[in-house]
A protein has these predicted regions:
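Internal intein/HINT superfamily modules and their associated LAGLIDADG
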Residues: 1-191
Length: 191
């Protein structure tokens, strides 16, 4: 659903080879643990990408059985499978995975009455409208107040972001490091 894709014979997951190095290790370990299967990592240095590839028709059929689709996710308007949405524990885990792959954390500045303020935000970006709506709905169901645009879901409230990192968490240390630096340690950008 996030940075992955299915063909008739392969599962592939593409990550940033520079900023997602630690997360790449986590994903590789998770695939081996869940499927007991061999995988390949292809690095494209000129694109800063690392592509995890797992070949096997049986794996693809298994994933299709869980509700994932072969082909272009946007054209097919992919969504979180219904069985995941029915159980909040699964929905939260899916939310975490989507944010880990298609999400970002950042500081932004704005001025009010000539005074500069800094805020931290979470942003999930995806071109599949049903997937975006489900992501938004899971956040709302769990007491958050996100905002949404045509391709993004944002969280800006400081207390909600703190709660998100406690309740939902992240397996992508890139996000955790930014949260700790900007929110916990209160280090402003460029310092």
């Amino acid at each position: 659903l996030g940075d992955g894709g299915l063909t008739n014979y392969q599962l592939s997951i593409t990550l940033n080879s520079q900023t997602d190095k630690e997360y790449l290790g986590y994903v590789k370990s998770l695939i081996r643990k869940l499927f007991h299967i061999q995988l390949t990592v292809m690095l494209r240095k000129n694109e800063n990408t690392a592509r995890i590839v797992v070949s096997g028709r049986n794996l693809v059929e298994l994933l299709k059985g869980y509700g994932l689709k072969v082909g272009n996710k946007v054209k097919q308007s992919v969504n979180i499978p219904a069985w995941v949405l029915k159980k909040n524990e699964f929905a939260i885990a899916c939310l975490r995975g989507l944010m880990d792959t298609d999400g970002s954390c950042y500081m932004y500045a704005h001025n009010v009455n000539k005074k500069r303020y800094y805020n931290f935000a979470l942003c999930f970006t995806n071109a599949s409208v049903p997937l975006l709506r489900s992501f938004y709905a899971i956040l709302k169901k769990n007491g958050y107040y996100p905002s949404v645009t045509d391709r993004r879901v944002y969280m800006h409230r400081k207390n909600e972001i703190a709660e998100y990192f406690k309740k939902v968490g992240t397996h992508n240390n890139k996000h955790l490091h930014k949260y700790q630096k900007f929110v916990v340690q209160k280090i402003l950008p460029g310092r």
